[in-house]
Amino acid sequence: MLFRSNESFARVAVAAFITHLNPTLEELADIKTAVSEAVTNAIIHGYENLSGYSRHGESIPAYSIVHPGKVRMHCVLEGDMLSIEITDQGKGIEDLKKAMEPLFTTKPELERSGMGFAFMEAFMDDLEVESTPGKGTRVHMWKKMRCGDWIGKED
């Protein structure tokens, strides 16, 4: 599926971004897991804004390759704080409080667990989600990095 390759690319990109910080394996796994959840959700729901197409009388899933939406990831390191922002131009989230409840999913047919936001909260130090129905969603995550021995850090 399309979102698998994009989700994998995002995980590799964020790993490359933090490599010079010499992260622990736990930090690296935590960040990659949180990014994976955020990007997968953005791709699945980001494409939904482009629904309404059909082929042979059968509805085409909005997350399909036919009309992809944009998903952006922005990473910044300020001091020892890593900031990662994932945005989409999807349909947005009608009930954000409900969507952030563990096990809540709007995509049971995709075998989604409904644990995306719970994983993001568990693996990152802080999480902020903003969403506007019809416009899209912004997920902003922060993690304090153990930056004592950066690779290439000047003494």
Annotate each PLM feature.
Residues 42-155:
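Conserved beta-strand-loop-beta-strand hairpin that lines the nucleotide-binding pocket
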Residues 11-12, 97:
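Conserved strand-to-helix beginnings and helix N-cap segments that scaffold or border functional pockets
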